[in-house]
Amino acid sequence: MVSTATFFFFVYLTLFVVIGFFSSLFIIPLLGISFVFAIGVVSFGFCSNMSFKMAQLIYVRADAFLKKVLDKMALQTQPAQLQEPQEPLSTLRPVSNPTIPSPLRQTARPSKFVTEEDVIFEPVSAQSAIARSLETTANKAGNKFQLS
């Protein structure tokens, strides 16, 4: 005769095998689908990175080309005539240096920064510092446009 322990062992073994079989029917297909989605994530990430690198290369080349064109255009423009300030000289004050620096260089190429020797005086008025900076930069670059 079979003991109770052996009987329950075979019952539990049968339940374990049956549950394992039915769970593998769900786990293996879901694992395959998960693998397919993981491949998709990696491939789309690669494509995204490559398209970003190509767009970055196009942007850098276009930016360099436009900078060259802008430099050529800046060299071909005529320097603007120096205008006399509308306000009396008593309202003018030095910007940063108490001594008068060298006058503006008429043949200078436009640069990103305005140095101390490029700016002689600025009028004391209610204009903002940004507007005065734009006027100085526009006059220095030789533009014929008036910013006001």
UniProtKB/Swiss-Prot annotation:
Transmembrane segments: 8-28, 30-50
Phosphoserine PTM sites in chain numbering: S102
Any single GO CC term annotated in Swiss-Prot or TrEMBL for this entry: lipid droplet
GO process terms (BP): ascospore wall assembly; lipid droplet organization
InterPro entries: Osw5
Membrane-topology annotation of the record: Multi-pass membrane protein
Signal peptide positions (record): none
MF terms in GO: protein-containing complex binding
Assembly mode: Interacts specifically with the seipin complex FLD1-LDB16. Only a fraction appears to associate with the seipin core components, suggesting that it may be an ancillary subunit of the complex. Found to interact with many mitochondrial and peroxisomal proteins.
Family under the similarity heading: Belongs to the OSW5 family.
Record protein name field: Lipid droplet organization protein LDO16
Organism: Saccharomyces cerevisiae (strain ATCC 204508 / S288c)
